[in-house]
Curated annotation (Swiss-Prot):
The gene is RBP1. Pfam families: FKBP_C (PF00254). Residues 23-122 form the PPIase FKBP-type domain. One of its GO terms (cellular component) is extracellular region. PPIases accelerate the folding of proteins. It catalyzes the cis-trans isomerization of proline imidic peptide bonds in oligopeptides. It comes from the Eukaryota. This is FK506-binding protein 1. The keyword Isomerase applies. Its EC number is 5.2.1.8. It catalyses: [protein]-peptidylproline (omega=180) = [protein]-peptidylproline (omega=0). Its main location: cytoplasm. Coiled coil: none annotated.
């Protein structure tokens, strides 16, 4: 049985030239919500973008896949995220925190919804 892939809805196209690949450092703004709309985290509300290395397990697998456009065979038609892209990522539990969740904030097998904006790749 193959894993579900993230769902990606592009809200605003990026530059379509600057794409992150595994091992790159990305800077993003995000708002994380449960499917019921309850917000559990927000870099925007903290007033500071989030920086991480993608594709190396530093963040949830759904982010690693989405932010590096590394969807495998099943994701050939999924939208690509480039610098400047604003998107809504719907991350299934198998690509988020799975059956363990992060009690009491994120329950077991929760689907997560992130509004993300890719601000930069490797400082660009």
């Amino acid at each position: 049985m193959s894993e579900e892939l993230p769902q990606i809805e592009i809200v605003q196209e990026g530059d379509n030239t600057t794409f992150a690949k595994p091992g790159d450092t990305v800077t993003i703004h995000y708002d994380g919500k449960l499917t019921n709309g309850k917000e559990f985290d927000s870099s925007r509300k903290r007033g500071k973008p989030f920086t991480c290395t993608v594709g190396v397990g530093q963040v949830i697998k759904g982010w690693d896949i989405s932010l590096t456009n590394n969807y495998g065979k099943g994701g050939a038609n999924l939208p690509k995220i480039s610098k400047g892209t604003k998107a809504i990522l719907t991350i299934p539990p198998n690509l988020a925190y799975g059956p363990r969740g992060i009690p009491p904030i994120i329950g077991p097998n929760e689907t997560l919804v992130f509004e993300v904006e890719l601000l930069g790749v490797n400082g660009q």
